[in-house]
């Protein structure tokens, strides 16, 4: 019997969505998405434990037996207020189609290598947080360096073959041009804090969406289509944050578009902003937007070699709700439009839903159901259609420095124009089942 994947996915999403669930989460010190998964940890730099107080009260769930203590750090405290730390994450991701190549898992974001285990992130950061409460006015900074299989996906885009910033800092490239390993500097910024204001200047992670690049901040080993194909990873520019209103955070600033660095070769210029509001003690709604000129790119020499990339508009809405008893739910909707370009506008949009259950301090399980529409075939694999995925995973945290993330993922593509697109298994199939796990060690 042929399964109607589309109907099954939508039905599952409706059932999960109807059970209202997930926690209003704090992005900690990663300076990334304000609703990111795992920075509920008591130490914002290490995704060690979700808030699970409710689970051990009247809910009758498993007791805490892990004995998690203070996370071990390679560099201890100092009198300058400086934090130095990082993590190493490594794992394996494969598929049941038997495609064992450098791109066998495509178009699954960040997990394209299917023929070998990978060191995904060897990450080091140095940070001093601006402390306005103690000093009234204070300055801070942060710098992040990444090497690994996630490096090429995190580098600054928009430079073609030009070596600008960290673009093309690749340490392993095949003869076919496949970038396997590389380095990146995704964050380098200064901050100024006074009163209820915090201003960031430099290159920093986006405030948009739910998932982000740093491995400890994400429940799942793989990423949603929206995160990789529909949202920016980083911005370069200035971003102000204001917390003077009750239960409300407001952002506003100017950036060099998406994923560019300090050399704005394409001439992008966009507004980045949003608002986050705590509807209740358990529920938070966050809306963010990035809009403006997406610049232009030179594809050939001569007066006709410059292509206008038009304008960009993209917004993301994320609702998080803490059900209690260890259950939490996240709803995300993204919408993007690239307009005023040759060949017509490009549209993309989607819905993600997450359901998490923390069993105890050691174990959590989660589900992610997603639908991503690449309406014009401009974002994912060059074929217009709908991408559906259902991911099921667990997090095992044997101590405060280690996270192990196994998962299985079911993906299905439904083309829009009847052309029978096959984006999986290197262009041979319209569906695929993936599996894998990684381990993260923080320091």
Where are these regions (language model features)?
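N-terminal periplasmic/intermembrane-space "pro-region" immediately following the signal or transit peptide
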Residues: 2-102, 108
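Hydrophobic, lipid-facing positions within transmembrane beta-strands of outer-membrane proteins
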Residues: 120-124, 183-190, 197, 234-238, ...
């Amino acid at each position: 019997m042929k399964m109607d994947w589309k109907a099954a996915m939508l039905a599952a999403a409706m059932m999960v969505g109807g059970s209202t669930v997930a926690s209003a989460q704090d992005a900690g010190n990663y300076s990334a998405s304000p609703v990111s998964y795992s920075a509920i940890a008591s130490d914002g730099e290490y995704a060690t434990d979700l808030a699970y107080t409710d689970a051990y009260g009247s809910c009758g769930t498993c007791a805490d037996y892990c004995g998690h203590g203070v996370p071990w750090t390679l560099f201890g405290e100092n009198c300058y207020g400086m934090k130095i730390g990082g993590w190493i994450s490594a794992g394996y991701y494969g598929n049941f189609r038997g495609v064992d190549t450098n791109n066998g898992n495509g178009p699954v974001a960040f997990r394209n290598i299917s023929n070998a285990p990978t060191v995904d992130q060897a990450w080091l950061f140095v940070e001093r947080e601006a402390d306005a409460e103690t000093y009234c006015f204070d300055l801070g900074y942060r710098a992040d360096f990444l090497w690994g299989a996630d490096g090429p996906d995190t580098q600054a885009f928009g430079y073609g073959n030009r070596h600008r910033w960290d673009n093309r800092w690749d340490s392993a490239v095949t003869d076919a041009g496949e970038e396997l390993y590389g380095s990146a500097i995704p964050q380098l910024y200064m901050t100024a804090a006074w009163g209820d204001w915090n201003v960031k200047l430099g290159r920093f992670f986006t405030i948009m969406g739910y998932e982000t690049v740093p491995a400890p901040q994400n429940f799942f080993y793989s990423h949603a289509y929206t995160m990789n194909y529909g949202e920016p990873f980083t911005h370069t520019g200035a971003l102000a944050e204001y917390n003077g209103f009750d239960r409300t955070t407001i952002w506003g600033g100017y950036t060099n578009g998406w994923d560019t660095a300090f050399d704005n070769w394409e001439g992008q210029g966009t507004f980045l902003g949003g608002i986050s509001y705590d509807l209740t003690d358990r529920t938070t709604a966050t809306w963010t937007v990035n809009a403006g000129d997406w610049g232009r790119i030179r594809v050939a020499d001569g007066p006709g070699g410059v292509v206008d990339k038009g304008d960009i508009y993209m917004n993301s809405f994320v609702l998080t709700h803490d059900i209690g008893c260890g259950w939490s739910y996240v709803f995300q909707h993204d919408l993007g439009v690239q307009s005023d370009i040759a060949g017509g506008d490009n549209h993309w949009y989607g819905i993600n839903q997450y359901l998490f259950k923390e069993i105890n301090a050691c174990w959590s399980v989660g589900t992610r159901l997603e639908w991503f529409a690449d309406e014009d075939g401009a974002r994912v694999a060059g074929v217009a259609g709908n991408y559906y995925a259902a991911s099921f995973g667990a997090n095992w945290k044997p101590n405060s420095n280690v996270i192990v993330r196994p998962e299985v993922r079911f993906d299905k593509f439904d083309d829009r124009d009847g052309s029978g697109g096959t984006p999986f298994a290197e262009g041979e199939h319209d569906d695929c089942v993936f599996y894998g796990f990684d381990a993260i060690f923080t320091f």
